[in-house]
Structures are given as structure tokens and as C-alpha cells.
UniProtKB/Swiss-Prot annotation:
Chief location bin: membrane
Glycosylation (residues): 9
Biological classification of the source: Eukaryota, Metazoa, Chordata, Craniata, Vertebrata
Transmembrane segments: 25-50, 71-88, 99-120, 143-161, 188-210, 237-260, 281-305
Record's protein name: G-protein coupled receptor 183-B
InterPro entries: GP183-like (IPR047160), GPCR_Rhodpsn (IPR000276), GPCR_Rhodpsn_7TM (IPR017452)
Membrane topology label: Multi-pass membrane protein
Alphabetized SUPFAM superfamilies for the sequence: Family A G protein-coupled receptor-like
Ranges in the topological domain labelled Extracellular: 1-24, 89-98, 162-187, 261-280
Cross-referenced Pfam families: 7tm_1
Cytoplasmic-side segments: 51-70, 121-142, 211-236, 306-366
One cellular-component annotation, GO: plasma membrane
Length: 366
């Protein structure tokens, strides 16, 4: 293994940004899609979760915190898109780089933890509904949510103590790039391996285990009750579970596996410039994939939550109704009755948006 000084000099003499012409177009393009979709989708999800329930429970608390973490995460993307659009150049200073890094990593791993909590909560609701009922009480869940935010904040605050920007040989200033960390932490490979295990390995195993048991239990329930199977509820629940697991694994696995394999190689032998270049490119690709999770979560809400789906459809109907109302109003000056009828329909739709809806499918009554 290289010494920190040699490792730093090695990365400085190795051109890690040959893919700049492609990255400065594709990455901002991806972020320009993820950011608005993620912000709008999660804002709507948060609105549905908060406004469409008469009683706060564990599911609504975890879902609301997940939506908040996704929204805050999306807020870090515009400046990151500017950075990539400028060809890996950060002209906004060290302080703002640290602030964006903190916002990025804090909400990324807060989201992972809240997704894990949702999996455990649904598992407890089905397998141990009476024995572990205290864990699902709103008062206790609030403490769990607060503990998650504080824990992830404590893990990411050290980022503020180190320099995250670096002036490259071509005078460009990079921000939050892997080579900027080399030489700062002596045991960087060990630290990142532990971080991957704690921040991704344990959560993904927990999520897969909980949802696998849930799927098995739902399958058993469907076999013993044909009426339940014919209703399609268990089939829908299994589909939702598969979607949640699929989105989590596809979005988060490549990034963490990429880091893990490279850190293991660094511990086994001295990696060369070509390997570091490949790792740098793969990091930029897998980070984009990980960011995609923040705008896919609302689609999981859409299919899993009745209230979310109905509110989206009603808002779309209201927009269509308003459009046709405007067209008729301008084209038919004498068509007063039709216009009034359209307005009445719009008012009905707007009133229905405020109705209480079932937030999320839960596998058993609690």
C-alpha cells in the first residue's frame, strides 16, 4: 500500500478528468431531470402524508422524514450540476463546497436509514404486531427519527474539518472528488470499507430480510384465504415490496460496490493510473444512479399509497378541466351554461382533493 504522500502525488500526476467533455453534458442533463422530478414528487408525497391522515403513526412519520431527506438531497443537485457543467470546476469557494457535501451525504444516508426503518416497521407490524407494538408508537418513532438525523449528522460533520476543494494542474478547482480525500486520511481504505458496511451493507441486508419474510407471510396468507388472493391485495403488496427492494438495490448497490472493490484492491496492491481513472469515471456514473433514487421514491409512493395516487390523478383532472374551461370561455362567448357546469365540476374535484385517504398499504391491522 502506498504512503499518503506518495498516493497524493500519484493522483496529482494522473489525469483523472479525460471524460470531461462527455461528463459536462450528460451529468447536468441527468441532474436537471432528477432535481425537479424529485422536488415535485417528494413535495406532493409529503403533502399527502401530512394532510391526508387523521392520526400520526409510524408509517406516516418514517415516510414524511424520508420525503424531507429526499427534498433536501435534491436541493444539493443544482450547484452540483453547475460544477459538472463547468467541466469539474468549482468557483464558489470552499465553504459552499462543504455545505453542499454535508447536504448531499447527510440526506443520502438519512434516506437509507428511513427506508430501513420502514422495512423493519412493516416487518414488526406483520410478524410481531402485539409483542413489539411499543416500537411502532408515534412517540417512540419520533425519538427514532431524531436519533437517525443526529447519528447521520455526527457521521458527516467531519467533512467540515477537511479541505474538500483542490486546485488541479490545469487551474480548475474540483469539489467532493475522491482524489481530494487521498492524503487527508491515513487509513482511508479502511474507513471507507467500514462506512460501506455500516451505511449500506447492514441496511440492504435488513431491507432484503424484512421484505423477504413479509413476502413469504403474504404468500402463506393468500394460500390459506382464497378470498384475500382473489381480491388482489396480496399480489399488489408483493409487487410493491419487489419495487421497493428493486429501486433500493439498483440505485445504491453499484456505488457502494464500486467503492468497496477499489478500496480492497488498494489494500492488496498499488493501483496504477489507469485503474484510478476507471474508478473515477465509474464513481461519477454510479453517483448519478444513486441520485436517481430521490426521484424514484415518489413513484414507489405512487404505486404503494392510495392517497398519493388519487391526489395525483385528481390534480391532473383539475388541470385538464381548467384547460378546457379556458378554451370554452374564449371560444364560446354565449356558452354560459357549459362554462358554469365546467366550473362546478372543477370545484367538486378541488373539494375531493382534501378528502382523507388511506396513506399506504399496510400488511396487517395494527
Amino acid at each position: 500500500m502506498m504512503s499518503p504522500d506518495l498516493d497524493l502525488n500519484f493522483s496529482s500526476n494522473c489525469n483523472l478528468y479525460d471524460h470531461r467533455p462527455v461528463a459536462r453534458v450528460l451529468i447536468p442533463l441527468v441532474y436537471s431531470i432528477i432535481c425537479p422530478v424529485g422536488l415535485l414528487g417528494n413535495a406532493l408525497a409529503l403533502h399527502v402524508v401530512i394532510s391526508s391522515t387523521t392520526k400520526i403513526n409510524s408509517i406516516t412519520l418514517y415516510s414524511a422524514n424520508l420525503a424531507v431527506s429526499d427534498i433536501l438531497f435534491c436541493l444539493s443537485l443544482p450547484l452540483r450540476a453547475v460544477y459538472y457543467g463547468l467541466g469539474f470546476h468549482w468557483p464558489m469557494g470552499e465553504v459552499l463546497c462543504k455545505a453542499i457535501a454535508l447536504l448531499f451525504y447527510l440526506n443520502c444516508y438519512a434516506g437509507v436509514n428511513f427506508m430501513t426503518c420502514l422495512a423493519v416497521d412493516r416487518f414488526v407490524a406483520l410478524v410481531f404486531p402485539a409483542r413489539l407494538a411499543k416500537l411502532r408508537k408515534a412517540k417512540n418513532v419520533r425519538f427514532v427519527c431524531l436519533a437517525i438525523w443526529l447519528l447521520v449528522l455526527a457521521q458527516t460533520l467531519p467533512l467540515l474539518t477537511i479541505g474538500l476543494t483542490k486546485t488541479e494542474p490545469d487551474s480548475s478547482i474540483t469539489c467532493m472528488e475522491y482524489p481530494n480525500f487521498e492524503g487527508v486520511f491515513k487509513g482511508l481504505p479502511y474507513m471507507l470499507i467500514v462506512a460501506v458496511v455500516l451505511g449500506f451493507g447492514i441496511p440492504v441486508m435488513t431491507i432484503i430480510a424484512c421484505y423477504s419474510i413479509l413476502t413469504h407471510k403474504l404468500h402463506q396468507a393468500a394460500k390459506s384465504n382464497q378470498l384475500t388472493e382473489r381480491s388482489g391485495k396480496t399480489k399488489k403488496a408483493r409487487g410493491v415490496i419487489a419495487g421497493v427492494v428493486f429501486v433500493f438495490v439498483v440505485c445504491f448497490s453499484p456505488y457502494h460496490i464500486d467503492i468497496l472493490q477499489y478500496m480492497i484492491r488498494k489494500l492488496l496492491y498499488e493501483t496504477d493510473c489507469k485503474e484510478l481513472q476507471s474508478f473515477q469515471i465509474s464513481l461519477h456514473i454510479t453517483v448519478c444512479l444513486m441520485n436517481l433514487n430521490s426521484c424514484l421514491d415518489p413513484f414507489v409512493y405512487f404505486f404503494a399509497c392510495k392517497g398519493y395516487k388519487q391526489k395525483v390523478m385528481r390534480m391532473m383532472k383539475w388541470q385538464v378541466g381548467t384547460h378546457f374551461s379556458s378554451v370554452k370561455n374564449s371560444a364560446e362567448s354565449s356558452g354560459t351554461g357549459d362554462v358554469l357546469g365546467t366550473r362546478r365540476n372543477n370545484r367538486i374535484i378541488m373539494n375531493n382533493v382534501g378528502e382523507d385517504q388511506q396513506i399506504c398499504y399496510q400488511p396487517s391491522a395494527t
